Amino acid sequence: MPYLLLFALLFALNAPLARAASCPQWSPQQAKAEVAQLRATLARWDEHYHRQGIALVADELYDQSRERLNHLQQCFAVGTSPSPLASARGPVPHPVPHTGVDKLADRQAVARWMAGKSGVWVQPKVDGVAVSLTYQQGRLVQLTSRGDGVNGHDWSRHIPQLDAVTRQLPEALDLHLQGELYLRLSDHVQAKAGSANARGTVAGLLARKQLTGAQGNAIGLFVWGWPHGPEQQAERLAQLARLGFPDSQLYSIAIDTLEDAAHWREHWYRSALPFATDGVILRQSSRPPAERWQAKAPYWIAAWKYPYAQALAEVRDVRFRVGRTGRVTPVLHLLPVTLDDRRITQVSLGSLARWHTLDIRPGDQVAISLAGLTIPRLEQVVHRTVERQAVAAPAPDRYHAHSCWQASEGCDEQFIARLTWLGGKQGLALPRTGPGTWRRLVEAGLVTSMTDWLQLDAERLQQAPGISRLTAAHLLGSFDEARSRPFDQWLRALGVPIGKHLPLTGDWQALASRSAGHWQTVPGIGAKRSRQLVEFFAASEVQAIAAQLAETGIEGFRPPPQRIEQ
C-alpha cells in the first residue's frame, strides 16, 4: 500500500507538468491579451450566427477555436467565458430543455462511453439547426430555435413555407418533438463534399423575416427527440414513422459493440445521404423522464464526430525555400495536426507575394485542408497572435534564374537545388546523387561550383561526413558516367530554359552565338523563351561553367581543333 500511495502522489504531482508542456510559453501579459482577443473573436462569431444567421467561419474551425479557448483558459487560469449560446437565448421557453452532447475524441473514448451500457443506438449527426416542434390536435403550431437550450426564438412564422416538414399528423395528437432542420441535399457524400456550409445556410434562412416557397422547400426535418414518447427507442422510432417521420427510423441502428459504431460512422461518412452530417450520435434506448432533462450534456447521449476537413494549426516558424530557378517558396512549419489520419507538420504558401499579402507570423492560427486528399493546403488565417514576431524574408530580387551558381553565403538552398537537378533524372541521371549527397559534399567544402565534383577522388570524398569507402566508390562510378553523357543532356542538366522535347543541335559555340530571332525560328520557341535562352548562354556564370567543362573534355563544350596551314 505505501508503494501505491507513493506512485499516486508522484502521478498527481507530475500531471500538471505534463499538461503544462502543451501550453504556450507566454508571459502573463501576453496570455491575458491572447485569451481576450480569442474571446472577442468567438463572441463576434456567436453574435453573427445566432442573431443574424451568418456563419463567419466554418463550423469545424469554430469548434476547434472554442476548444483552443478552453485549453488556454485552463493553461493560464484566466477564468471562463460566457456560454457560447448566451447570445442565442430568446424569449420563448422550451417545453423540455434541449440537452447538450459530449463529444468523444476517438475510438478509445467511444469504448469507454459504451462500457457497461446496453441498448445503444447510432444515428447520423445531422448538421443543421436544432428546434423544438409543438403539435396541437395534430397540427404544427410552434417552432422554437434551440437558443441556449432553455429559451429560444419563435420561428413559427416559417411553418407555412416548410413544405418538406410534416405540418399535419395523421392523428389529432398533442406532442412535443425535438429535431434538426437541415438543408435538403441530393446524394450528399460527406467524405467528398464536406459540410457544404449546410448549417450556416439553414441558419441564415431561418433568421429571415419571411421565406419564399422555394426557400422553405429546401429545408427538411430530422426528428431525434421525443421527450414524452415511449420508454424504449425502438417503439419511439416505430411510432414516429407512423406519424410521418420515417427518416428517424431509417437512419437509426441498434448496436452492441465499438466495431458496430465505427462501421456505421464510416458507412454514413462515405454514403450518399439527403443531408450533411458531422459525425454520429450514440444514445441509450432508455433515458430519464423528460422532467429531469437539463440544458447540459447527459450521460445517455454522446457524439462521435467525423475527422475534420480543415484543421486549426499553430504556425511555429516561417521558412523560405529557394528552388533551382530562384523561385522563393514560403513554408509554414506547424505544430503537428492530423487530417484524415495524416500527420501534417508543414504547408507551402506557393509564392513570396502570397506570404506578404497574408503576413503570417509564428504563433498565428491557420486553417489547413488536404488538396486531393494528399497535399496540405492553406485555406485561411483564422487567428493572428497579438505579439507579431519578426520574420527574416529574402528581398524579392535576391534570387533569380542566374543567382547562386556557386556556393556562397545565403546560396546553399539554390545551389544544392541546381546540383540535385544536374544529377537527377531530368539531368545527367547519375545514380546515388540525391539532395542529401550533394548537401554533404557542399557542407564539407568539397563542392563549391557546378563542376568541382568531377575532380574529386575517393580519398577526398571520404572526408565528407556520412560517405564511406563503398559510397565513395559508387559516387566515383557515377561521376565517371557523367563524362560520357551527350552534350544536349549536359545542357539540360545545367538548366537550359527549353522544353525537353525541343532539339538542341550544335555545339556550345554555335548555340551561344544564336540571336533571339534565330531561336524563334525553332518551332515551339516564342519571344519570351528566346530571350531567356539568349540570357542563359550570355550569363558569365554559365560561360565559366562551359569553359570548365571544356577543360575537362566534355563533348560539345570543347572548341573545334585549329586547322594548321601547310
Swiss-Prot record:
Active-site residues, as the UniProt record annotates them: K125
Keyword tags: DNA damage, DNA repair, DNA replication, Ligase, NAD
GO terms for MF: DNA ligase (NAD+) activity
The UniProt record lists the keyword DNA damage: yes
Reaction catalysis annotation: NAD(+) + (deoxyribonucleotide)n-3'-hydroxyl + 5'-phospho-(deoxyribonucleotide)m = (deoxyribonucleotide)n+m + AMP + beta-nicotinamide D-nucleotide
Coiled-coil region list: none
EC annotation from Swiss-Prot or TrEMBL: 6.5.1.2
Disulfide bonding pattern of the chain: none
Listed GO biological process terms: DNA repair; DNA replication
Superkingdom of this protein's organism: Bacteria
Pfam families: DNA_ligase_aden, DNA_ligase_OB
KW DNA damage (keyword) present: yes
Family the UniProt entry places it in: Belongs to the NAD-dependent DNA ligase family. LigB subfamily.
PANTHER family documented for this protein: DNA LIGASE, DNA LIGASE B
Functional description taken from the UniProt entry: Catalyzes the formation of phosphodiester linkages between 5'-phosphoryl and 3'-hydroxyl groups in double-stranded DNA using NAD as a coenzyme and as the energy source for the reaction.
The protein's name in its UniProt record: DNA ligase B
